[in-house]
């Protein structure tokens, strides 16, 4: 875990254990990790304060976060205990900033390297940006940057998840016509 305060917002970056196989010692360690994270959050943070908790949480919280729930049934990332741990973490006062802007299925942050899964969009949404209410009300858009996942060599089996938190009183459209235009401007290229 890495934590810093940026422009008055506490940013906490985490990486959850994979869990490997449901029922294994690695899976038990993953659930213990979630319990510890929930305890830390309750002890060290305030749900009324600006907070972003994000990273690879290795959980697809809902069936729409998986390309084929039947194919993944019984595996890690989608099991009942993992989803319950994720729900307990959020129940304290964290909201899924990405899902707020994108309720539709078929949008993922992770694809296996094998069998062309990325190009077939056989993926999972296991990376998350969970935010408290003060941040959620300022989050103007969210996007999965699939472009970063393309090319050779493939940099990662994950794609970056991005949210934009605007200052209060500043309009979203500062000359950009879309979120894609804003991403392109930040990269210094045309949309």
Question: Model-derived features: where do they sit?
Answer:
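Catalytic metal-binding/acid-base residues of hydrolase active sites
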Residues: 17, 58-60, 102-103
């Amino acid at each position: 875990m890495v934590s810093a305060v940026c422009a008055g917002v506490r940013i906490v970056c985490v990486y959850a254990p994979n869990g490997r196989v449901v029922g294994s010692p690695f899976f038990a360690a993953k659930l213990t990790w979630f319990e510890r994270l929930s305890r830390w959050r309750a002890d060290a943070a305030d749900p009324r304060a600006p907070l972003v908790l994000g990273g690879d949480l290795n959980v697809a919280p809902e069936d729409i976060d998986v390309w084929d729930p039947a194919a993944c049934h019984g595996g890690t990332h989608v099991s009942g205990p993992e989803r319950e741990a994720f729900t307990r973490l959020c129940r304290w006062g964290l909201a899924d900033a990405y899902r707020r802007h994108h309720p539709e299925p078929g949008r993922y942050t992770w694809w296996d390297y094998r069998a062309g899964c990325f190009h077939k969009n056989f993926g999972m949404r296991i990376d998350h940006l969970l935010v408290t209410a003060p941040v959620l009300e300022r989050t103007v858009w969210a996007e999965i940057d699939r472009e970063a996942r393309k090319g050779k060599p493939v940099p990662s089996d994950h794609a970056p998840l991005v949210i934009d938190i605007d200052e209060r009183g500043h309009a979203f459209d500062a000359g950009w016509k879309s979120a894609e235009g804003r991403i392109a401007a930040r990269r210094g290229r045309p949309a």
